């Protein structure tokens, strides 16, 4: 097993460049001369260097690994093989977005396969289990085969026929048979054996014509599902037709024939006349010379290509009789037994030399590096689009990113040269297209909602650049200048934008900054993060409503059943991680912890399924919402990023200084790190346990920096039982500098407190956080619950006195009559992430003053003003605060003197601790 790519690549970058200077965030300074910039002396560890041990993360991960182990990757490869015209090995593509029948005609197919490859690569990098390696090798082998097939002209896929062999046209191959065009006679017969494999309406068995006005065709199914022959010189409105009476059965051979003699046309199925038209004024000769004689392709671009097998196609210059139709006669115009087993030329057995050619509707790739599960047409069409239409073009470069990332991840973790070659070729192909486009065309493309979305492709390209030294110019072709400039100038332009279309752009900009030193990339990424966290952040760490951003500081107004698209959380974690490598601000890992322990963990249902990853797409944040773990049949973007998240939970637990002088402990997660000859074992039940233990095996000198979470009111450290005098301020790191010896033990204690976080737009709409954990109310009611919390508040401001633990259920509590549970539990219980704060009376430590809690015009209350000053150093300090606030409210006419006196007496008698 090969160590993770991240460490190796960052080492390479660090050896080539100097550490970054301390940067400000003013756009003016972005004019500095660009040069490559390594992260500020800080490096991540590879997946193989950090092993998860038993805990909440390993349990979720193991569910995903079970899915990865059991799922047949040939099902995912089906659409790639079909697109290349290859045998799909009997595999059935998954449903949802990854198949041809998915949303928008399957225009996003291939993206989930890329996610799956990344998951396998990370699983192998983490565990070394050969089952994942074999699946990776199968996928890479198929990709190589598909790319080779796309590079050449279509080749016949020979299958057993009705007699001898037949030609199979795989659904999704976009292949058809091109017969030599020639004028047709007035009398005419077409016969063929057909075996449809799909029930798409209007797929043609044959279509001879010039365009969509002058043609004759036989469709396997019309709009009513039965065969139809038609001829016209004036488009659909002028068609003279014959309809069958019953559908052609799927996966069975049927004999079809059309005869035309004089004014009579007849349609036969299996030798039986199923339709006739005796009033036809048109015949094939009346159409004159036609440009195209196609088998399987329509002159209407929106019609599907015929999927199935064709055998014994014959064209006659006379109308066969009913008895002759099913006889084994050879057409005098042309005759195709389709007995070929190789090549792309199909011989004419009539003796006239009218040999046919297998072709693709879209021709073929513009560059040999092209690899996709669909034709190149989406990429071509995007270049002239001016408005979004995902039914026509759905984020082709987004799908290309998933495939590219999967290939890069596969190379990172296996060193399989095929993955590198495929990734390199894919980038060469992209540059061959994008490099020719004017800048204004690219800017228009990248600004189109959905169609122009390209995900994290820049990050993947720069990752590949660190290996090959190539493709940096390609990465810069994805610059969306209007967005970069606005964010570099710290202008918030996010309202109304599609969140996940834009979040991964900024991780790519950070990677470009590292490669080029261009500070506008750094400024844009750093400033963008602050536009989302916290102004557009839900308490679970996610962002977006219905996939889009609302105005800054609109959070309560964004609570819906389509809140917090899970991809957004995944990509914000990647951005936060990368920002921390440059700027060791604890805020990035405070956010990382919040999002990882809540939305990301909670996005995985707590059960296994052999067919589905069981991940959320949206998070329902409405009162009484229920999480949907099977959105859109299980192959969406969010299920893809969910699989990736679950197989790299450990990638940010620890970071190290590039000179190995310091180890950062960013997350408190049970794990084992092997580094510089030392093994560090972190043992914890966090977040059930409110602390952690680190044991050192081996000897080394280094600084150990421990993150003090922003929520931690208390944080104590001992080494070998000896208390350490550290200035553990919330939202910082504390550092222990020493020569570590074998057997040293570091223990950290960080008691959780309960706090209520209010939304900026509706302060009374709040959520409960217990340490880093979002506690949700398990309740099916569909209106916001009203909860009061001040009545049991401690001098520290901790609200945990309101909670009654549920025996035998860690992190489960009762708050009065309301049951609370951690959001990260992946259940289908109805829940409330938010509630309405209601403090009708002034109560201290359970003692009721009998005084109503007065409210200012802005909605803030007397108790709010008291408790905003917490923590209180002593009971005396608390009494001083109550007295001062009461006096002020009396002075402002908001409280009577009598109520003032009752409040003061209650505060003095209350058993505050």
Task: Label each PLM-derived region with a short phrase.
Residues 277-309:
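Flexible glycan-contacting loops in extracellular carbohydrate-active proteins
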Residues 840-913:
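Soluble extracellular-acting proteins and domains
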């Amino acid at each position: 097993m090969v160590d993770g790519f991240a460490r190796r690549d960052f080492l390479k970058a660090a050896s080539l460049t100097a550490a970054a200077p301390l940067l400000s965030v003013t756009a003016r300074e972005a004019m500095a001369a660009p040069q490559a910039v390594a992260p500020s002396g800080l490096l991540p560890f590879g997946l193989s260097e950090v092993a998860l041990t038993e805990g909440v993360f390993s349990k979720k991960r193991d569910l995903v690994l079970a899915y990865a182990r059991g799922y047949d990757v040939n099902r995912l490869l089906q659409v790639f093989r079909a697109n290349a015209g290859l045998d799909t090995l009997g595999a059935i593509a998954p449903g949802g977005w990854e198949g041809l029948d998915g949303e928008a005609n399957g225009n996003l197919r291939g993206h989930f396969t890329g996610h799956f490859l990344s998951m396998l690569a990370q699983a192998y990098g983490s565990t070394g289990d050969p089952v994942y390696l074999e699946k990776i090798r199968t996928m890479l082998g198929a990709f190589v085969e598909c790319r080779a097939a796309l590079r050449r002209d279509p080749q016949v896929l020979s299958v057993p026929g009705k007699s001898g062999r037949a030609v199979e046209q795989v659904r999704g191959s976009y292949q058809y048979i091109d017969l030599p065009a020639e004028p047709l006679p007035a009398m005419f017969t077409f016969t063929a054996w057909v075996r449809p494999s799909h029930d798409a309406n209007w797929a043609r068995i044959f279509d001879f014509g010039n365009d969509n006005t002058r043609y004759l065709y036989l469709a396997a199914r019309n709009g009513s599902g039965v065969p139809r022959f038609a001829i016209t010189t004036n488009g659909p409105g002028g068609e003279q037709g014959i309809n069958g009476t019953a559908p052609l059965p799927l996966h069975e051979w049927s004999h079809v024939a059309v005869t035309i003699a004089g004014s009579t046309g007849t349609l036969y199925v299996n030798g039986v006349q199923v339709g006739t038209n005796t009033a036809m004024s048109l015949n094939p000769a009346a159409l004159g010379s036609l440009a195209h004689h196609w088998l399987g392709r329509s002159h209407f671009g929106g019609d599907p290509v015929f999927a199935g097998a064709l055998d014994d196609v014959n064209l006659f210059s006379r109308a066969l009789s009913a008895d002759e139709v099913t006889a084994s006669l050879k057409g005098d115009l042309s005759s195709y037994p389709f007995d070929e087993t190789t090549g792309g030329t199909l011989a004419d057995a009539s003796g006239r030399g009218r040999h046919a050619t297998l072709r693709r509707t879209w021709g073929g790739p513009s560059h040999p590096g092209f690899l996709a599960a669909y034709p190149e047409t989406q990429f071509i069409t995007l270049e002239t689009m001016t408005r979004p239409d995902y039914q026509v073009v759905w984020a082709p470069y987004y799908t290309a990113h998933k495939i590219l990332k999967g290939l890069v991840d596969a190379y990172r973790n296996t060193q399989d040269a095929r993955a590198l070659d495929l990734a390199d070729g894919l980038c060469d192909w992209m540059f061959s297209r994008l490099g020719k486009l004017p800048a204004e065309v690219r800017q228009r493309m990248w600004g189109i909602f959905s169609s122009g979305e390209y995900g994290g492709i820049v990050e993947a390209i720069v990752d590949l650049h660190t290996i090959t030294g190539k493709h940096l110019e390609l990465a810069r072709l994805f610059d969306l200048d209007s967005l970069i400039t606005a964010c570099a100038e710290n202008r918030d332009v996010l309202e109304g934008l599609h969140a996940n279309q834009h979040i991964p752009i900024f991780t790519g900009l950070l990677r470009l900054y590292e490669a080029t030193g261009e500070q506008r990339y750094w400024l844009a990424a750093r400033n963008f993060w602050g536009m989302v966290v916290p102004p557009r952040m839900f308490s679970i760490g996610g962002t977006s409503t219905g996939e889009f951003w609302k105005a800054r500081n609109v959070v309560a107004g964004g609570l819906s059943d389509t809140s917090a698209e899970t991809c957004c959380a995944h990509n914000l974690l990647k951005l936060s991680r990368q920002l921390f490598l440059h700027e060791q601000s604890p805020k990035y890992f405070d956010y990382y912890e919040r999002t990882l322990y809540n939305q990301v963990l909670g996005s995985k249902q707590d059960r296994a399924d052999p067919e589905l990853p069981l991940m959320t797409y949206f998070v329902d944040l409405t009162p009484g919402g229920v999480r949907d773990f099977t959105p859109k049949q299980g192959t969406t973007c969010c299920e893809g990023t969910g699989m990736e998240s679950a197989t790299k939970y450990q990638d940010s637990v620890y970071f190290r200084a590039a000179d190995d002088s310091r180890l950062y402990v960013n997350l408190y997660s049970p794990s084992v790190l092997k580094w510089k000859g030392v093994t560090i074992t972190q043992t914890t039940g966090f977040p059930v346990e409110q602390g952690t233990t680190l044991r050192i095996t081996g000897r080394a000198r280094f600084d150990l920096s421990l993150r003090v979470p922003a929520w931690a009111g208390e944080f104590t450290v001992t080494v070998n039982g000896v208390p350490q005098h550290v200035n553990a301020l919330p939202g910082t790191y504390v550092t222990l500098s020493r020569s570590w010896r074998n057997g040293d033990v570091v223990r950290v204690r960080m008691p959780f407190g309960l706090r209520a976080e209010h939304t900026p737009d509706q302060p009374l709409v709040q959520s409960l956080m217990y340490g880093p954990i979002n506690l949700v109310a398990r309740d099916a009611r569909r209106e916001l619950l009203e909860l009061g919390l001040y009545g049991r508040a401690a001098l520290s401001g901790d609200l945990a006195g309101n909670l009654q633990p549920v025996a035998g259920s860690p992190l489960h509590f009762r708050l009065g009559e309301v049951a609370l549970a951690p959001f990260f539990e992946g259940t289908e219980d109805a829940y409330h992430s938010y509630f309405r704060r209601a403090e009708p009376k002034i109560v201290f430590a359970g003692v009721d003053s009998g005084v109503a809690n007065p409210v200012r015009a802005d909605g803030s209350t007397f108790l709010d003003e008291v408790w905003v000053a917490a923590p209180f150093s002593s009971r005396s300090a608390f009494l001083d605060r109550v007295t001062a606030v009461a006096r002020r409210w009396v002075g402002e006419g908001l409280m009577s003197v009598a109520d003032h006196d009752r409040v003061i007496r209650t505060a003095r008698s209350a058993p505050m601790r």
